[in-house]
């Protein structure tokens, strides 16, 4: 990890083959072929009119990855991921399709409700440049990563694993917020100047793969992925994580939010991943003074037409929000309507998982 000008750059363990050169003040990518493949032609001693001895292969002549070992490295990483997650019973990705619906907060409190049932729970904060789980869970600066090696991020000789910090109630948490101060950002370096958008997804998922294969997950009942917002991002994570991962979607009683989540449902339905259902978050707010649920949005019930099961409706509780801001996770759910709603969602989630 390199820090420069307030930015954090991660060096990944996967090599992508291309090397970058500068020509006419512009970034240019050129392949680095292995010996025995093609090489730039050189003029023979016979002069300019002589026949060139080496012919450059065309696109359709190249077999495999051109000697970069990308395919081999991807296969090796997949093996590390499979081995690393061998002790995890259920993988559940929590997505929203739209930001601002309280997905990360719900993920943490749902993890708390599951943990209160005696289950072994971990959270992977997959929003690398907008991590929030570290602060909410109270584990900022608590993650130690072994020095990188040729075998990958956080892996020293292939034997050292990243040990995760835990909340006061025993939830293991991986979040970039435990590594990167809030005043700094995570950057994915590009091989071509001004073209970082074409490389970002590749780099980001390579990093996710390294994390999955390098962390000591151990024996878990559930690993919850807190996904970044965006309908397209949700589908990308489904494709990367594979059919073993089930999805739980979060929305609020708003027509706008419902419409975006409906797009996520439509896109996920085309793939092999199972959609467990959705949670209607912030269905109202809990008034401690009057001990009642008050309306928060005007669109109550607008999200009920998603075509997937509703696992529950969770009202907003200002007290829980204050706990998150201070990084004080609740050791056990309070006896409030919010706590009972979260416990209901946890039970419905477990029932859905067990019915697979």
Where are these regions (language model features)?
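Extreme N-terminal, non-catalytic leader segments
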Residues: 29, 38, 44-97, 142
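P-loop NTPase nucleotide-binding/switch module
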Residues: 74-90, 135, 141-166, 174-177, ...
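Residue-level signature of catalytic and energy-coupling elements of molecular machines
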Residues: 88, 99, 125, 133, ...
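Walker A/P-loop NTP-binding active-site region of P-loop NTPases
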Residues: 93-167
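Switch II (G3) loop of P-loop NTPases
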Residues: 178-202, 207-236
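Conserved catalytic-core segment of NTP-binding enzymes
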Residues: 210-322
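C-terminal boundary of histidine-terminating zinc-finger modules
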Residues: 326-335
């Amino acid at each position: 990890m390199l820090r420069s000008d307030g930015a954090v750059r991660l060096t990944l363990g996967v090599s992508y083959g291309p090397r970058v050169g500068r020509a006419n003040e512009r970034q240019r990518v050129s392949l680095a072929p292995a010996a025995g493949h093609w090489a730039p032609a050189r003029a023979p001693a016979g002069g300019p009119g002589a026949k060139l001895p080496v012919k450059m292969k065309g696109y359709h002549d190249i077999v495999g990855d051109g000697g970069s070992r990308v395919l081999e490295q991807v296969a090796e990483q997949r093996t590390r991921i499979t081995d690393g997650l061998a002790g995890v019973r259920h993988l559940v990705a929590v997505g929203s399709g739209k930001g601002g619906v309280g997905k990360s907060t719900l993920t943490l409190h749902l993890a708390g409700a599951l943990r209160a049932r005696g289950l072994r729970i971990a959270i992977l904060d997959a929003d690398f440049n907008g991590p929030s789980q570290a602060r909410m869970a109270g584990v900022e600066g608590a993650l130690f990563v072994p020095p990188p090696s040729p075998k990958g991020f956080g892996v020293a000789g292939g034997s050292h694993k990243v040990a995760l910090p835990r909340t006061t109630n025993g939830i293991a948490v991986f979040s970039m917020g435990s590594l990167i101060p809030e005043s700094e950002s995570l950057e994915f370096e590009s091989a071509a100047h001004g073209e970082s958008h074409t490389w970002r997804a590749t780099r980001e998922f390579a990093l996710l793969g390294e994390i999955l294969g390098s962390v000591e997950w151990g024996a878990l009942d559930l690993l919850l992925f807190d996904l970044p917002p965006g309908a397209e991002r949700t589908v990308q994570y489904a494709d990367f994580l594979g059919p073993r991962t089930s999805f739980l979607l979060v929305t609020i009683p708003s027509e706008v939010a419902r419409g975006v989540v409906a797009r996520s449902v439509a896109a996920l339905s085309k793939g092999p991943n199972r959609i467990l259902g959705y949670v209607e978050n912030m269905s109202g707010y809990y008034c401690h003074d009057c001990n009642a649920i008050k309306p928060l949005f005007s669109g109550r019930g607008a999200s009920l037409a998603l075509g997937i099961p509703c696992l529950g409706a969770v009202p907003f509780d200002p007290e829980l929000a204050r706990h998150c801001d201070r990084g004080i996770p609740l050791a056990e759910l309070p006896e409030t309507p919010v706590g009972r709603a979260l416990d209901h969602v946890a039970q419905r989630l477990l029932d859905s998982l067990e019915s697979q």
